[in-house]
Amino acid sequence: MFSKNPTGERLEQGDLSQGMAEHLHRYKIAEMFCSDKSVLDIACGEGYGTNLLSKFAKTIAGVDIDNQTVVEAKLKYSAENIQFAQGDTSNIPFPDSTFDVVVSFETIEHHDKHDEMITEIKRVLKPDGVFIISTPDKYVYTDLKGVKNKFHVKELYKKEFIDLIKRFFSNTTILNQKFITGSYIYNESSTTNSPKIWYSGNFNKVEQTARPEGEYTIVIASNAALTIPPDLEKESFFIESNFIDKLTAQFKSLSIRYKVGYAVLSPLRILKKIFVKPGK
């Protein structure tokens, strides 16, 4: 099932994509900070992330710039501890020091008012609150690929992004995220987070390679001492085991439909060549 959202910029339930794994993994990280807290999910989109965090948060607000999106989110997610409101990153409709945690995933690259956004988020965040934000690293996401995302107004290089957050928050923890399609073999009896060995290759040669560059940077920031959950000290993997199988099945289905359609129409093409003169 594909989303009704063809741009891929906003994840919706029903999406089957790399973005699905990336976004859900980020929300799983955020969940570690939200237990019994007041939480803000800024640029919440259709609200799936707000809903996920609501299962752990005391209260949660989802804010989005698009009014119709907010209306639909209210209808779709109606838990007692959830509310949705219209607003943007420079004008959040809540009083000062409202939230224990603010989450903002893949938002800052969609505009150029970066200082205004962080200033506004800091306003609604409690003095000892935690801010969790992510954005693609321009070098890996754009420069290395040679392709620009037309929906991104101002991407940041990793150092620029980290420096921006550090101007507003005294304590930060930096995480890197990379989508990987591959096979993961681990030692079942190991109790430590041992260094990983990465391999790459083909049918002719398999060899050790460097760890992939993180495509996205996630920063956890606070002006209070950061208490990092034990699980965050470990590397984590989001597994969608049927991801490739589902895509393969979908494309096979499309291919079969094409072949059947071609077979049905082929006799008509032959007759057309016989009976229809050129120019008719």
Identify what each model region corresponds to.
Residues 1-97, 101-105, 115-118, 178-179, ...:
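Conserved N-terminal segment of class I S-adenosyl-L-methionine
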Residues 106-110:
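A short His-aromatic
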Residues 132-154:
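Short, glycine-/aromatic-enriched active-site segment of Class I SAM-dependent methyltransferases
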Residues 153-168:
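Short alpha-helix
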Residues 169-181, 198-206:
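Conserved S-adenosyl-L-methionine
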Residues 197-201, 209-210, 214-218:
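A conserved mid-domain beta-alpha-beta active-site/ligand-binding segment of alpha/beta enzyme cores
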